[in-house]
Each structure stands twice: as C-alpha cells, then as structure tokens.
Amino acid sequence: MANHKSAQKRIRQTKTRTERNRYYKTRIKNIVRDLREAVLNKDVAKAQEALKIANKELHKYVSKGILKKNTAARKVSRLNASVKKIAQSA
C-alpha cells in the first residue's frame, strides 16, 4: 500500500478510471456485436439503425478520450462497409 497521500489518491483515481473505461469498452463491444448480428442475419433496417448508434457512440468515446481517433475511424469504416455490402445485395 502507498505511504504518501498523493500516491493513495492516485490509486483511487486509477481504480475509478479503470472501472469507467471498462464500462465504455464493454458498451462498444456490445454495440458492435449487435450490428454484426444484424449483418449476419441480413437485416438491413436493423443493421442501418445499429450503424447509426455505433457511429454516434464511437465518436463520442473519441471526444472523451476512451478511444483513439484512428481506432474509431477504422471501426466505423469497416462497419459501414459491411452494412453497405448487405444493403446492395438485398
């Protein structure tokens, strides 16, 4: 255990931030999973709605500093491509 008051505070802050980041990362994974399920089932309407939500959430987490800009851009690009592919084939 830390002896300095500032070190104890840092430990508390790290714990809080870790929990918060874990919540956001889990939320991102769930949103992406829902979108991929809709794509696999070839449900265009549901996929487009899920894409809208995913796009909004990913960009929000970039502004909060949870994700890096290029990571979110890569995820959005790949998700867009998968939805576009099923929309064209339908």
UniProtKB/Swiss-Prot annotation:
GO cellular component: cytosol; small ribosomal subunit
Any one Gene Ontology molecular-function term assigned to this protein's record: small ribosomal subunit rRNA binding
Family designation: Belongs to the bacterial ribosomal protein bS20 family.
One matching Pfam family: Ribosomal_S20p
PANTHER family the UniProt entry points to: 30S RIBOSOMAL PROTEIN S20 (PTHR33398), SMALL RIBOSOMAL SUBUNIT PROTEIN BS20C (PTHR33398:SF1)
Annotated source species: Helicobacter hepaticus (strain ATCC 51449 / 3B1)
Skewed-composition ranges (Basic residues): 1-15
Protein name, per record: Small ribosomal subunit protein bS20
Gene3D superfamilies: Ribosomal protein S20
Region described as Disordered: spans on this chain: 1-22
GO BP terms in the entry: translation
Lineage, top ranks: Bacteria, Pseudomonadati, Campylobacterota, Epsilonproteobacteria, Campylobacterales
InterPro entries: Ribosomal_bS20, Ribosomal_bS20_sf
Keywords, ordered alphabetically: Ribonucleoprotein, Ribosomal protein, RNA-binding, rRNA-binding
Function: Binds directly to 16S ribosomal RNA.
